[in-house]
C-alpha cells in the first residue's frame, strides 16, 4: 500500500493533461505570444511547444532568443501535448502531429533561463519600437487581374507596398462561371516584424523603388548579425501533419501573410544601406581598362622607324646631290640629268652659261634660316616622341635645294624653249 502511495505523485503529473482531447486542442484559438521550452524539428525547422496539455506550432514570423528555447510568434494548436523526450516525430505527433520522423528532441519541462537574443523585436513579449507603420484595420485581401508592378521577394514570398500597407501574394482565386476569371490575391500583412524591417531599411535595395518593373526585386535581409532562426515559408504542421496542422499552416495566418517576416532570418550579412564605393570602382576600372605604357620602348620604336626612313631618303638625296653637283661643276649631266646634255649644250657650258650670268642679278635673295628647335609630339604622354634638329636641318636643306633646282630647271627650260623657237 505504501508503495502505491509513493507511485501516485509519479502517475498524476503524467496524466495531468488527460482532460484535453484532440478536438478540444484544435478548437483553441490561435495566440500571438511568447512560449518557453520550445524545440525545433531538425528536418522541417518547425518549432513546437507544449502548453495546457496541447501541442502548439509556431507559424508566421517567429522571433527567438539566442538559445532558441523561447520564441515569440503566432502559435497554432495542432494536437495533444507530446510527452517529454519523445521529440516531434510521427509517433509523438500522430496524424495531428507537427513533424516528420524523429525530428528534434524536446527540452525538459523546466529548462534553463533563455539567453537574450540580438533581435529588434523583443521575443519575450513581442514589443517593438513605437511609430512604425501598421497595417490598416481592413483585413480583406485584394484581387488583381494581373501581377502588380514593383513587388519584392523575401523568403520566397512576394510582397508589395500599397498606400503604406504591405500585402503578400497568397495564390490565385477564380470567380465567375462564364467566363471564369482568375485573380491574383494579395493579403494584408499583420506581422509587426515585417513592417519594422521594411520601414527601417533592413531589406537591401528593396524597401523603396520605383518605375514599372514586372519582375519582383529579390530582397536580402541586412539586419544585425543574427542568432535568429529562419522559419520555413508558409510553415504549417509539418510533413506528417494531419487536418489540424496542415490546414492552419497554409492559410494567411500560418504563412501567407506572415510567412515572409523579416526578423525570422535571412543572411544577416551586410551593414548600413549599401553605399556605393565610387573610388574603389574607379580604381578597378582603371586597372582593368588601361595598361602601363613603356615610354622608353615607345620612343625607341618610333626613333628606329624614323631613322630607317631617314636613311633611305638620305641615300636618295645623296645621289641626287651628286648628280646636281656634277651638273653645276661642269662635269656634265649624269644620273637623273643625263637626258639634258643636248639642251645644256645649246645654252652654254653648264652653270657658266652666259645666259645665266645675264639673269643672275634678277634672282631673289636666298631666305635666311632660323634657329632650329626639336619637334616634340605628344609631350608628357606615354606615346611621346621627338625629331632632333639634325634631321630637321637635313630636311630643310634638301627641301630648299630641291626648290632651287626646280626653279632653275623651270627658268632654264623656259629660256631654252625661247631660243629654240627663235632658231626655227
UniProtKB/Swiss-Prot annotation:
Location of region: G2 (Gly-rich linker): 236-274
Predominant place of localization: virion
Keywords for the protein's UniProt record, in alphabetical order: Capsid protein, Disulfide bond, Host membrane, Host-virus interaction, Membrane, Signal, Transmembrane, Transmembrane helix, Viral attachment to host adhesion receptor, Viral attachment to host cell, Viral attachment to host cell pilus, Viral attachment to host entry receptor, Viral extrusion, Viral penetration into host cytoplasm, Viral penetration into host cytoplasm via pilus retraction, Viral release from host cell, Virion, Virus entry into host cell
InterPro entries assigned to the protein according to its UniProt record, in alphabetical order: Attachment_G3P_N, Attachment_G3P_N_sf, Phage_G3P_N2_sf
Residue span of region Hinge: 105-141
Membrane topology reported for the UniProt record: Single-pass type I membrane protein
Positions of the UniProt region annotated as N1: 19-85
Region (N2): 142-228
Sequence segments annotated as region (Disordered): 83-147, 222-279
UniProt GO BP: adhesion receptor-mediated virion attachment to host cell; entry receptor-mediated virion attachment to host cell; viral extrusion; virion attachment to host cell pilus
Signal sequence annotation: 1-18
Gly residues composition bias: residue spans: 86-105, 235-273
Family assignment from sequence similarity: Belongs to the inovirus G3P protein family.
Quaternary assembly: Interacts with G6P; this interaction is required for proper integration of G3P and G6P into the virion. Interacts with G8P. Interacts with the tip of the host pilus. Interacts (via N-terminus) with host TolA. Interacts (via transmembrane domain) with host TolQ (via 2nd and 3rd transmembrane domains); this interaction allows the phage translocation across the host inner membrane. Interacts (via transmembrane domain) with host TolR (via transmembrane domain); this interaction allows the phage translocation across the host inner membrane.
Described function: Plays essential roles both in the penetration of the viral genome into the bacterial host via pilus retraction and in the extrusion process. During the initial step of infection, G3P mediates adsorption of the phage to its primary receptor, the tip of host F-pilus. Attachment of the phage causes pilus retraction bringing the viral particle into close proximity of the host cell inner membrane.
Protein name: Attachment protein G3P
Organism: Enterobacteria phage f1
Gene this chain is encoded by: III
Amino acid at each position: 500500500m505504501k508503495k502505491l502511495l509513493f507511485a501516485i505523485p509519479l502517475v498524476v503529473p503524467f496524466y495531468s493533461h488527460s482532460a484535453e482531447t484532440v478536438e478540444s486542442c484544435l478548437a483553441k484559438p490561435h495566440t500571438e505570444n511568447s512560449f518557453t521550452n520550445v524545440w525545433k524539428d531538425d528536418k522541417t525547422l518547425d518549432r513546437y511547444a507544449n502548453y495546457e496539455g496541447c501541442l502548439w506550432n509556431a507559424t508566421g514570423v517567429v522571433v527567438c532568443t539566442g538559445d532558441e528555447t523561447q520564441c515569440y510568434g503566432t502559435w497554432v494548436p495542432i494536437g495533444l501535448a507530446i510527452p517529454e523526450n519523445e521529440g516531434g516525430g510521427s509517433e509523438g505527433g500522430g496524424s495531428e502531429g507537427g513533424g516528420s520522423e524523429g525530428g528534434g528532441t524536446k527540452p525538459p519541462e523546466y529548462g534553463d533561463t533563455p539567453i537574450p537574443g540580438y533581435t529588434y523585436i523583443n521575443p519575450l513579449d513581442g514589443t517593438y519600437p513605437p511609430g512604425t507603420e501598421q497595417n490598416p484595420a481592413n483585413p480583406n485581401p485584394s484581387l488583381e487581374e494581373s501581377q502588380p508592378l514593383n513587388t519584392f521577394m523575401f523568403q520566397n514570398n512576394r510582397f508589395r507596398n500599397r498606400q503604406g500597407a504591405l500585402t503578400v501574394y497568397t495564390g490565385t482565386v477564380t470567380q465567375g462561371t462564364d467566363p471564369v476569371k482568375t485573380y491574383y490575391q494579395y493579403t494584408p500583412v499583420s506581422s509587426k516584424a515585417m513592417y519594422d524591417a521594411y520601414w527601417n531599411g533592413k531589406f537591401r535595395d528593396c524597401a523603396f523603388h520605383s518605375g514599372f518593373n514586372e519582375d519582383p526585386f529579390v530582397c536580402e535581409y541586412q539586419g544585425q548579425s543574427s542568432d535568429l532562426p529562419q522559419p520555413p515559408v508558409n510553415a504549417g504542421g509539418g510533413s506528417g501533419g494531419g487536418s489540424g496542422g496542415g490546414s492552419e499552416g497554409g492559410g494567411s495566418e500560418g504563412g501567407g501573410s506572415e510567412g515572409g517576416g523579416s526578423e525570422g532570418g535571412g543572411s544577416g550579412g551586410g551593414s548600413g544601406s549599401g553605399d556605393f564605393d565610387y573610388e574603389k570602382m574607379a580604381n578597378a576600372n582603371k586597372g582593368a581598362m588601361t595598361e602601363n605604357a613603356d615610354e622608353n620602348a615607345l620612343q625607341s620604336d618610333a626613333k628606329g622607324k624614323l631613322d630607317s626612313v631617314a636613311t633611305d631618303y638620305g641615300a636618295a638625296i645623296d645621289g641626287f646631290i651628286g648628280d646636281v653637283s656634277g651638273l653645276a661643276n661642269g662635269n656634265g649631266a649624269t644620273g637623273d640629268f643625263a637626258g639634258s646634255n643636248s639642251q645644256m649644250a645649246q645654252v652654254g657650258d653648264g652653270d657658266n652659261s652666259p645666259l645665266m650670268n645675264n639673269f643672275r642679278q634678277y634672282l631673289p635673295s636666298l631666305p635666311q634660316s632660323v634657329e632650329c628647335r626639336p619637334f616634340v609630339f605628344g609631350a608628357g604622354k606615354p606615346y611621346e616622341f621627338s625629331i632632333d634638329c639634325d634631321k630637321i636641318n637635313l630636311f630643310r636643306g634638301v627641301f630648299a635645294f630641291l626648290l632651287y633646282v626646280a626653279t632653275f630647271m623651270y627658268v632654264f627650260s623656259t629660256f631654252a624653249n625661247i631660243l629654240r623657237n627663235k632658231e626655227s
